[in-house]
Curated annotation (Swiss-Prot):
Native species: Corynebacterium diphtheriae (strain ATCC 700971 / NCTC 13129 / Biotype gravis)
Enzyme Commission identifier(s): 2.7.7.6
Protein name (Swiss-Prot/TrEMBL): DNA-directed RNA polymerase subunit omega
Classification via HAMAP family: RNApol_bact_RpoZ
Summary of subunit composition and partner proteins: The RNAP catalytic core consists of 2 alpha, 1 beta, 1 beta' and 1 omega subunit. When a sigma factor is associated with the core the holoenzyme is formed, which can initiate transcription.
InterPro entries reported for this sequence: DNA-dir_RNA_pol_omega (IPR003716), Pol_omega/Rpo6/RPB6 (IPR006110), RPB6/omega-like_sf (IPR036161)
GO molecular function terms noted in the UniProt entry: DNA binding; DNA-directed RNA polymerase activity
Keyword annotations of the record: DNA-directed RNA polymerase, Nucleotidyltransferase, Transcription, Transferase
Function recorded in the entry: Promotes RNA polymerase assembly. Latches the N- and C-terminal regions of the beta' subunit thereby facilitating its interaction with the beta and alpha subunits.
Length: 92
């Protein structure tokens, strides 16, 4: 859902939601949208485990490869890493 611009001329602001990074840019790094979902979910799970283990002083997983923004979710971080080409994806 997006918000109507202040001048009420029917022009809409940029949509909110999962738009950054754009899906088209993410799909350049994988073979399909399904592979993207699995790839991003696995990396998000690793990032989440990293944060949980950091509290315990254990570092089994690699932390974020991009600088996380305040309150940024692990899935958003994973997608930014994929867009930046910081992760290698092997299917199979």
């Amino acid at each position: 859902m997006s918000n109507v611009a202040e001048n009420n001329d029917g022009v809409y602001d940029a949509p909110t939601g999962i738009t950054a990074p754009p899906i088209d840019e993410l799909l350049k790094h994988v073979s399909s949208k399904y592979a993207l979902v699995i790839f991003a979910a696995k990396r998000a799970r690793q990032i989440n485990s990293y944060y949980q283990q950091a509290d315990e002083g254990v570092f089994e997983f690699v932390g974020p490869l991009v600088t996380p923004e305040a309150q940024e979710k692990p899935l958003s971080i994973a997608m930014r890493e994929i867009e930046a080409g910081l992760l290698d994806h092997e299917e199979g």
